């Protein structure tokens, strides 16, 4: 059974190389992600071709539930062309063997476009899909948002700077914080993390929402170097205003976390976005992912902000694909 032996350095290196070189690679499928989610149990499986080369892989994390069965989740996985459903079935079969009856479901949510045809094909292959059928519950009906604002930089082959991507009206918005004296620096040190965490917790308190502990982000720093993870910090006259965390992996840079201070931020979040996009341009990265939105509506503040930078329509993903392993527990725990 092709289950990755995490105690075999050569096997781990080969697996990681495949994950990082694959056009389907996702940072949440990297082995480092299990170090971030250190209260979950990692299980990693793969398929090889006749020459012994890895052709598909899935990194699962197993979490506890109120029952005696685990929840198995491959975030944004697997790493393969998921539209090849026969190959997907083979990989899922290996995953099910590796889970050995311990999980009630294997869930994965690849960044593949939704279509009625693909949705039906998955269901015909025995999978339960959660997408438009749960959309009325909003963006948090699924673990990952299904509607994402993604800037496709391959459409701008001659662009050298962020401003090259936009018409004059948008250029003016992006320039405004810099005209007002906002400056942005980036790195992956404890100093930048402390600055991020201050803005992150301030924003959470302002909106009355929970937030992750600093140890979570420290584990993220330990798992990913500055070529993969960068913290962007916007200041004006030495005063902290806004921050963001972005991760570069595979074909994209993903704007993952953000924070801002109370009061006048002089449009510093625009400056942070500008510099993150510049990082993508400087590294010839295909996509810049601003993450999820509630809806394509001016009533959604997330959409309004992200639409400044992404003029295309949101990408609608296929959503969650469940391989149900214990129907009774699944019916108890999964509510549509």
Curated annotation (Swiss-Prot):
The record marks 109, 320 as: Important for catalytic activity. Changing residue 319 to V: Reduces activity 20-fold. GO terms for molecular function: UDP-N-acetylmuramoylpentapeptide-lysine N6-alanyltransferase activity. The keyword Nuclease does not apply. InterPro entries: Acyl_CoA_acyltransferase, FEMABX, PG_Glycine_Bridge_Synth. Changing residue 216 to F: Reduces activity 25-fold. Its EC number is 2.3.2.10. This is UDP-N-acetylmuramoylpentapeptide-lysine N(6)-alanyltransferase. It comes from Weissella viridescens (Lactobacillus viridescens). The gene is femX.
């Amino acid at each position: 059974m092709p289950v990755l032996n995490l105690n075999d350095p050569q096997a781990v290196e080969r697996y990681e190389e495949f994950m990082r070189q694959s056009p389907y690679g996702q940072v949440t499928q990297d082995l480092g992600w299990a170090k971030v989610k250190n209260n979950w149990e990692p299980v990693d499986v793969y398929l090889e071709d006749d020459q012994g080369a890895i052709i598909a892989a899935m990194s699962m994390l197993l979490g506890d539930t109120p029952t005696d069965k685990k929840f198995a989740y491959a975030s944004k996985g697997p790493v393969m062309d998921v539209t090849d459903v026969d190959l997907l079935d083979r990989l899922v079969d290996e995953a099910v063997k590796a889970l050995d009856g311990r999980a009630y479901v294997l869930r994965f949510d690849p960044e593949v476009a939704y279509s009625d045809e693909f949705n039906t094909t998955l269901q015909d292959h025995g999978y339960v899909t959660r997408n438009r059928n749960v959309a009325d519950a909003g963006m948090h009906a699924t673990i990952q948002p299904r509607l994402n604002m993604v800037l496709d930089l391959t459409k701008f082959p001659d662009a050298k700077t962020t401003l090259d991507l936009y018409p004059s009206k948008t250029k003016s918005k992006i320039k405004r914080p810099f005209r007002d004296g906002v400056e942005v620096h980036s790195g992956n040190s404890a100093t930048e993390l402390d600055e991020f965490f201050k803005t992150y917790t301030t924003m959470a308190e302002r909106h009355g929402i929970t937030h992750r502990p600093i140890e979570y982000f420290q584990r993220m720093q330990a798992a990913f170097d500055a070529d993969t993870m960068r913290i962007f910090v916007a200041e004006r006259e030495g005063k902290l205003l806004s921050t963001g965390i972005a991760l570069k992996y595979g074909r994209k840079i993903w704007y993952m976390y953000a924070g801002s201070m109370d009061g006048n931020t002089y449009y510093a979040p625009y400056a942070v976005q500008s510099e993150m996009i510049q990082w993508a341009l400087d590294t010839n990265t295909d996509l810049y992912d601003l993450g999820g939105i509630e809806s394509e509506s001016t009533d959604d503040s997330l959409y309004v902000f992200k639409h400044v930078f992404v003029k295309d329509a949101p990408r609608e993903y296929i959503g969650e694909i469940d391989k149900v392993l214990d129907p009774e527990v699944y019916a108890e725990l999964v509510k549509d």
